Structure formats: structure tokens, C-alpha cells
Amino acid sequence: MGDLEKGAATHGAGCFAKIKVFLMALTCAYVSKSLSGTFMSSMLTQIERQFGIPTAIVGFINGSFEIGNLLLIIFVSYFGMKLHRPIVIGVGCAVMGLGCFIISLPHFLMGRYEYETTILPTSNLSSNSFLCMENQTQTLNPAQDPAECVKEVKSLMWIYVLVGNIIRGIGETPIMPLGVSYIENFAKSENSPLYIGILETGKMIGPIFGLLLGSFCASIYVDTGSVNTDDLTITPTDIRWVGAWWIGFLVCAGVNILISIPFFFFPKTLPKEGLQENVDGTENAKEESTEKRPRKKNRGITKDFFPFLKSPVLQPDLHAVHPYKVLQVNAFNIYFSFLPKYLENQYGKSTAEVIFLMGVYNLPAICIGYLIAGFMMKKFKITVKTAAFLAFCLSLSEYSFGFCNFLITCDNVPVAGLTNSYERDQKPLYLENNVLADCNTRCSCLTKTWDPVCGDNGLAYMSACLAGCEKSVGTGTNMVFHNCSCIQSPGNSSAVLGLCNKGPECTNKLQYLLILSGFLSILYSFAAIPGYMVFLRCIKSEEKSLGIGIHAFCIRVFAGIPAPIYFGALIDRTCLHWGTQKCGAPGACRMYDINSFRRIYLGMSAALRGSSYLPAFVIVILTRKFSLPGKINSSEMEIAEMKLTEKESQCTDVHRNPKFKNDGELKTKL
């Protein structure tokens, strides 16, 4: 019975004692972590509107994930090598799930979302205070004492999102450094690029599901089930619309916890891929005995930490890699974190539509590119020198084509008092006193309220009152306003709720932009895999996990944390009109100067990426002049293969020779 149980246990362990099974589990972890991260990025505008906070704070929330990573990355990368790496990864996935759950809590702890409006949900002529009426002062619906602003439940609820994102970052910490080093240690060197390509593909599959989930959640009203959506006076294209962001985070929490389970069944070490089973046993025994040596002394692990830390930090080969990646990640963090906001404001689309289009055009192209790049590196056994040169050329080509984005633009929606005068003349700046004109001074309108209507003349107005409208017909989003004194048109001088559409020409430009973006995504993914392999080969095998950790540390300190914060502050400077909360305090931005937004958004990304190619060129030179620690030249490879063949033939002879009666003699011979 004991032998049967031992055999069953061995068989069970054997199912998980394979590098490809671990690769599959790690790919799922990459999918889950990128699913959560992409969904978070896609919901930034929803969080901004839900809590009425500026973009700078939203950028801080986005960067808080990197803060969580930063707290543990180096220690996990080093001490994780001494511990059971798969189990540490499993715990990390579970912690990510906890973080996602905490992010969703504010929805259950605060009241319903009340957007800024003076319009009642039903057309009641006795209560049409939102229309142009002489000798009557408008108020937001409902009104509160401004002193109550700080007491609003939602005023600090965004801190839950901040803390949850930090915890999510802590949980994500061990996945990349420990997972990649685990694969690098036990995979064939020629298979490593393909495996890394599969991981990177998993990292792109996650965003596909994340964007689809984000698109679905953004199309559902945040308080669905507790409000009658027919009474809403806003649509998904309205900048005040908030989608059901909390649903997606609950889904992400469940996925992360489920993905964590398989990692608790993997062994601490795996057989080296490509070696015979008997040789594997010998090598693994050596590895295990080596790993157990430091445990003879309690302080053995911590004693060597700081001396060990110096090696990758002071390694000359990595000096050019760090600034290159920091500049690149700054640019990409800015570009992808604020891409939904840019497309919404530039092309006048809803969050749900923008997120869906991003997933359709960009991510499949990146996935295909990752797989092809990994396969080509394995197929042609591309050297480190060639990989560095190839990555440099492809990345530079993608960067050059990216300047076409500056040409595919749309103008601001014309809004009287903001971008245009009431006579339709364009104005360079927004001045608060310009929102009033001779046609609406008698109406006693609120000048800060954002209840936009689109007139028959193609000009939008900040509210029906500011358009001089005196009558309304219909309910909800079907409400129509008549007798509008500020609307000069040959027709009925009427207006409908919402901003004016940007027209089919702008929609066509969005299609051109997305096609260009898909093409650039393919070039980017072709360059990413060889570039990442150059980085891995710059690190000694025994320092790989710590080297990856230090690299991630540098990226988080100088790119992941500051980029969304400083760029969010720059975006706030392009705001033309800030929203107003119930109590009168400023809320989220309602309209941006899209021309300034475009120059900052595209210009900052281009400047950061352009400056990154100087250290990239240095990397190409270094790989040609110096022998990298992770590189194996052809002669060494031939000698290793000859030794392996000789050992395998000895192993075969030993099995055929009857004079070896036990395993001890067999191991002695080997």
C-alpha cells in the first residue's frame, strides 16, 4: 500500500514537474494580471467622473500600482530565489485578487451617483427652472450648503481605489521576476525566446479580455438595477456618464484567485529541459543540495544580500539598458494610460466604443507579432548582437511612422462661450464672463453648470438656459427645447440634449488612426521580443531574478509612478471647463482644449521615445564589442553538446551492462 501511495504521489508531482506545464500556468497568470491592469486603465475616466476628481489624482491612483510593486520588488526578486518560487507566485496572484475586491468596495459603501444637472427627469412645466426664465435664479438639483462638501461620503472614497491598487501592485510583484527566472533556469536556451514570446502573448491576451470587459462595463450605467435608466438625461457619449466599473473589478478578483491555485502544486525545481531523465535526476540533486547549503546558517540568506545586490547594479552592460527602458516606459505609460481619454475627446466617441476599438485593432496585432518574433528567434537562432540591432531598427521604424498621428486630427466641438463666440467666431481662450451674451443675460443662468445642448445651427451651448430656450418637450434623453433666443437659424430655433456630433469626417479619421495603430503595434511587437532577450542576456544566470527585479525597480521609480502623475497634471492644464459638484465645489473636467491636449499627449510621448534611442544605440555598440554574461558562443555550445552526447551514450551503456546492480553504482559511473 505504501508503494502504491508513493507511486501515486510521484505521478501527481510529475504532472506539474514539467516546464511547459509551468509555462501554461505562468501564461495564465500573465493573462490575469494584464486583464486587471488593462481594465484599471480603461476605467480611469469612469473613476474620475464617479468621484469628481482631477486627472492629476487619477494619475496618482494609476501610479499607486507601481508604488505597491516598488515596496517589495527587489526583496522578492532576491529572497524569492531562496524560497519556493511557484508558491510565492501563487500567493501574489491571490493578493492581486484581494486588491481588486477592495477597489470595488466604494460602490457598496457610497450612495447613488448623482451627475451635475439642473434638468428634472420628467418634463414638468411648473418646475422648469432649468429654462430661460426672467427674475428667477437657477440652482443645481438638489442644492446643498457648500460647507457640506467635505462631509460627502464620496469625497474620500477614492482612497479605497488607491489602497486596493497598491495591494494589487504588491501581489503582482513576484510574477515576472520569479516566473521568468524559473523558466530561464530550467528551459533550453534556444527555447527561451519562444517561451518569453508566449508569455508576452499572454500579457497581450489579458488586455484583449480586459478591454472587452471594460467596454461592456462602460456601456452599463453605474447604478444599474437601482435606478430607472429611462429617466436619465445623459447617454454613454456624455462626459458625465459613469459605467459600472465595479462589476469588472469583481470579475478580476475572481479570476486572479482562481489562477493562483495551480502554483501551489509545482515543485521548487524542475528537470532541465532537453536532458535525459537519469541525467536530470543527477542535476536536480546537485541543484537541491546547492540550494540547501545556505540553510545551514540562519543568516546565510540575508548576509549575502547587499554584496549580491552590487553585482547587477554595477554591471556595465546594464547601464544603458536602464535609461532606455525608463524613457520608453514613460512614453508608453503616458500613451496607453490616457489613450481612451484622448480618443473620447478627440473623436467624440463613448468610452465603451473607444475601449472596444482599441481591443479590436491593437491587441491582436501585438499578440501575433509576439508569437512570430519568438518563433523567428528560435527558428534562426538569432544571436544577441543580431537581436540588439534588429530590435533597434524595428523600434526606430515604428517610432518614425508614429508621427503620422499628428496629421489625423479633429477640432473641438464648437461650444458658445468656450471655443466659439455666440456669433460662431472662434476664440483663443475661455473666459468665464464670455458664457453670457445679450441673448441670455435676462435668463439669470448659472454660468458653471454643464448641461450641454446642441442647437439647430450646429453650435452647442453649456445649458438650455444659456441657449435662451424657454420651452421643453419630452422626457429623459429625448427632451427637445424650443424658442431658443441664442440660436440663430432659419428653422424653429430649437435644441436637443447633448453636444453636437463631430460628423462622419471625424469618424473616418478615427478609422485611419486605428489602422495606423494596428500597423505600429505589429512593428512594436516584432522589436519587443529580441529587445527583451538582449536584456536577459545582459544578466548572469545566477543573478537573473535579482537583475530583473532591479530593472523593474528602476522602471517603477522613474517611469511607472511619476509618468501618470505629471502627465495628468499637464492634461488638467488643457481643461476649458470644470464640472461642479452638488455643493458647488469643482469636480471633474467637462471639456478640454483638444488641440492643446493633442500637442501635449502626442508631443510628450514622442519626445520621451526619441531621447531613448541614444542609450539604445549605445546598447547596440556594447553588444558588438563585449561578451555578455548570458551569451553562449558557438564553440562553447558545441563543447556542451559533445559532453551531453557523451554522457547520454555512457548512460545507455550502463543500462545495458549487467554488472551495475544498483543505483549507487550507476550514479558513481555517471
From Swiss-Prot:
Cytoplasmic domain ranges by topology: 1-20, 81-86, 185-203, 268-311, 378-381, 537-545, 624-670
Transmembrane parts of this sequence: 21-40, 60-80, 87-111, 156-184, 204-224, 243-267, 312-333, 354-377, 382-405, 514-536, 546-571, 606-623
Residue ranges that the Swiss-Prot or TrEMBL entry lists as coiled coil: none
Listed SUPFAM superfamilies: Kazal-type serine protease inhibitors, MFS general substrate transporter
GO cellular component annotations of the record: basolateral plasma membrane
GO biological process, any: monoatomic anion transmembrane transport
MF terms (GO), sorted A to Z: bile acid transmembrane transporter activity; organic anion transmembrane transporter activity; sodium-independent organic anion transmembrane transporter activity
InterPro entries: Kazal_dom, Kazal_dom_sf, MFS_trans_sf, OATP
Highest taxon of the lineage: Eukaryota
Predominant location: membrane
Segments in the Extracellular topological domain: 41-59, 112-155, 225-242, 334-353, 406-513, 572-605
Keywords tagged on the record: Cell membrane, Disulfide bond, Glycoprotein, Ion transport, Membrane, Transmembrane, Transmembrane helix, Transport
Membrane topology: Multi-pass membrane protein
Glycosites: 124, 135, 483, 492
Disordered: annotated segments: 277-296
Disulphide linkage map: 439-469, 445-465, 454-486
Organ and tissue specificity: All isoforms are detected in kidney, and many are kidney specific. Isoforms 2 and 13 are also detected in liver. Isoforms 4 and 9/K4 are ubiquitous, but isoform 9/K13 is kidney specific. Isoforms 5 and 14 are detected in all tissues tested, with the exception of pancreas and spleen. Isoforms 11 and 15 are detected in kidney, pancreas and testis. Isoform 7 is detected in kidney, liver, testis and spleen.
Bias-annotated ranges (Basic and acidic residues): 283-292
PANTHER family linked to this entry: ORGANIC ANION TRANSPORTER, SOLUTE CARRIER ORGANIC ANION TRANSPORTER FAMILY MEMBER 1A2
Chain's role: Mediates the Na(+)-independent transport of organic anions such as methotrexate, taurocholate, folate and prostaglandin E2. May contribute to renal secretion and/or reabsorption of hydrophobic anionic compounds. Mediates renal clearance of methotrexate from the blood.
Protein name in UniProt: Solute carrier organic anion transporter family member 1A3
Source organism (scientific name): Rattus norvegicus (Rat)
